[in-house]
Each structure stands twice: as structure tokens, then as C-alpha cells.
């Protein structure tokens, strides 16, 4: 015969069971809380242009996949990470993922970050080697640890512990050949002066871009992808192989919150591609979100950030004949209303997916002409 429970014992027993069941069903930091958001938000995914170029085996692009998953009920960040994985795994993308152009030693080191607006959680990895999809590792940093950023061997060890296959010497054959050509051009120019050496490395890479050996976009690489669903839940992710031929250990803006990516679930999201050092110095994604908080449209917020970057670019080596920045830098942003924009230092393109399907659109630009003018 079963023992009869009094009311106090019943409440204590059922409460404990409910808590245990709930804890077993969710990741370490829990599910996103229920949010009260304005009705009528139109779902949107906005990304750099490679978000509507690389395709999976079914011919689906990053923004299309993310939008379909998101509007089908998937968590927004899950959808975005699945979308950028298409680009990370594309062997023709030498600026993102395992096939990205390596560092000066011929080693591929990847960076990624993600932010979950409703959960107010973030995760990032920098300088991780031997992993094909760093954005997913960054997501697990957010979900399974109390940290926001893991770097180098520590990031790799964490990925291994999470079940990722670590591939030693992971490099795409095309990227390896391009690295060898860069080495051939720069070995005679290894000066004792670090500044001269760095400039020689950079100039050799840009010359390879001019000759068509490297796609200019892939020299800096990166994909940023941000999304908002019909409930107004906002997330973002940025992933990259970083600057081609970088000094080993260099981390740019992509894994740094506030630079390569920033999300405030009540305001909006912003992310970037282009010259990481210039973006990192100005924490531009944070600036954009704060401008949107003050009421600025995403386009105007991004223009404000670009003007700050231009104002703080004073080294002659970084200026063209017009006295303007001689590099590319682009921002992709959206606000809590579902308004979005792609804005660049110079004319470029970006990707977006709405109920009208995936599109590649022209960015708004701070300057006319080209960075090299």
C-alpha cells in the first residue's frame, strides 16, 4: 500500500520533481525568457554578401536557411549559426572557415562570436585551430560555460571536449598555394624593423588582390549574420579566418563583443566585415547599437560609426590620395522594429532575407569611389 502524503509533503515532492525535470531539459544557462514585444515585427535576416552566395548541397544560402529555420520556430541563434555554417564549410570561401587564408606561418586560425539577445548571453573563440565551424563552438561557450571568450589551445581543448573532431594541419589546398606565393614575394623583405616588415607583408597581400590572385573580400574575410523573428527576438553571429597572412596569434574584431558583433535584445544588432583593427579601435558595433537606442535608423547609426572610424584614421599608410581611409569596412544592422541596413565605407553589397526571399542589395556608402582612389 502506498504511503498517503499530506499537503506539505505533496507540494515539496512535486516542486522538486518539476525543478529537476526542467533542469534536465535545458542547457546550462536556460532557455530564452518569454518576452513581451510589439506585435507586427516582420522577421528578417541581414548579413554580409557571402550570406547569399555560398550554398549548401540543396542550393540554399546562409540567409535563406537561417530565415526558414527562424520562421519555422527554431531559436534565432540556432538558425543563424546553422546559416553561417554553410559559408564556413564552403571550400571556395578563403575568408571564412577551414578554407580561409592562413596566418604568416601557414596555419589557419579562426575567430567567431555570437550573442543571444533574449538570454543576454554571449560566446566567442579566437585563434582556434583544427575546427571547421568555429561559430558553433562560440555558441557552446555561451551555452555551456560561464565565460564569453576562449582562445587558442584552450578553445581547441573545449571544442574537443564538446565532441568536435580536431583536424591537425587543416588547410585548403587553394589557400596553401596562395600562402606559398605570398611567402615567395615577402621572404626577401623580412626586415629587422617590425613596422617595415608588417608593411611589406600587407603590401604583398594587397598586390595579390590587385592581380586577381585573391578576392579582395577574402583578404579580410568574415561573415556577419543577424536576425530578428516575429516575436522580436534578436541574435547575431560573426565568424572569420581573419586577415590573410596575419602574425600568428593575431585576433581582429570578429571575436570581440562590441567590435565585430554587438546585440541588445531590446534595441538591435550590428556586425561587421573589413579591416578589423580599425573597427576594433572604435568598437563600432557597440556604437551602432547605442545610436539605435537613441532612436537612429540602422543606416544612420552605421554612418555615424563609419564617420568615427574615418576621423580616427590618421596614419598616412591608411589613407588614400583623397585623405580618406584606404580600406574597406562594412556594417550590417537591424533594430527591434525589423528595420535593417547594410552600410560600407565604400560602395559594396550585402545580403538580406525577408518574406520576399533572399536578396543581394547595394550598401549605402560613406564615400563615393574606391578605397584605392
Show which residues each predicted segment covers.
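N-terminal secretory signal peptides
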Residues: 1-5
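Alpha/propeptide regions of enzymes that mature by internal proteolysis
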Residues: 12-20, 31-373
Amino acid at each position: 500500500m502506498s504511503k498517503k502524503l499530506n499537503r506539505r509533503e505533496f507540494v515539496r515532492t512535486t516542486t522538486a520533481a518539476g525543478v529537476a525535470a526542467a533542469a534536465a531539459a535545458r542547457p546550462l544557462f536556460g532557455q530564452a525568457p518569454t518576452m513581451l514585444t510589439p506585435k507586427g515585427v516582420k522577421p528578417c535576416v541581414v548579413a554580409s554578401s557571402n550570406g547569399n552566395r555560398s550554398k549548401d548541397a540543396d542550393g540554399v544560402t546562409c540567409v535563406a536557411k537561417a530565415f526558414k529555420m527562424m520562421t519555422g520556430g527554431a531559436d534565432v541563434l540556432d538558425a543563424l549559426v546553422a546559416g553561417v555554417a554553410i559559408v564556413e564549410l564552403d571550400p571556395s570561401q578563403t575568408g571564412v572557415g577551414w578554407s580561409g587564408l592562413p596566418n604568416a606561418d601557414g596555419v589557419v586560425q579562426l575567430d567567431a562570436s555570437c550573442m543571444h539577445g533574449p538570454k543576454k548571453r554571449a560566446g566567442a573563440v579566437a585563434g582556434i585551430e583544427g575546427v571547421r565551424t568555429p561559430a558553433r563552438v562560440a555558441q557552446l561557450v555561451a551555452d555551456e560555460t560561464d565565460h564569453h571568450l576562449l582562445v587558442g589551445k584552450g578553445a581547441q581543448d573545449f571544442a574537443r571536449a564538446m565532441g568536435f573532431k580536431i583536424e591537425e594541419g587543416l588547410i585548403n589546398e587553394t589557400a596553401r598555394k596562395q600562402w606559398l606565393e605570398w611567402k615567395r614575394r615577402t621572404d626577401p623583405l623580412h626586415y629587422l624593423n617590425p613596422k617595415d616588415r608588417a608593411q611589406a607583408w600587407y603590401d604583398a597581400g594587397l598586390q595579390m588582390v590587385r592581380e586577381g590572385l585573391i578576392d579582395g573580400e577574402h583578404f579580410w574575410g568574415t561573415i556577419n549574420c543577424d536576425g530578428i523573428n516575429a516575436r522580436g527576438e534578436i541574435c547575431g553571429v560573426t565568424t572569420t579566418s581573419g586577415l590573410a597572412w596575419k602574425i600568428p596569434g593575431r585576433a581582429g574584431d570578429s571575436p570581440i563583443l562590441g567590435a565585430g558583433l554587438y546585440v541588445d535584445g531590446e534595441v538591435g544588432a550590428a556586425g561587421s566585415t573589413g579591416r578589423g583593427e580599425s573597427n576594433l579601435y572604435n568598437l563600432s558595433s557597440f556604437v551602432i547599437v547605442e545610436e539605435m537606442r537613441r532612436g537612429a535608423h540602422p543606416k544612420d547609426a552605421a554612418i555615424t560609426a563609419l564617420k568615427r572610424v574615418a576621423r580616427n584614421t590618421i596614419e598616412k599608410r591608411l589613407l588614400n590620395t583623397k585623405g580618406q581611409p584606404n580600406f574597406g569596412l562594412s556594417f550590417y544592422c537591424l533594430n527591434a522594429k525589423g528595420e535593417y541596413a547594410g552600410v560600407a565605407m565604400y560602395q559594396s553589397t550585402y545580403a538580406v532575407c525577408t518574406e520576399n526571399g533572399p536578396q543581394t542589395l547595394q550598401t549605402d556608402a560613406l564615400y563615393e569611389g574606391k578605397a584605392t582612389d
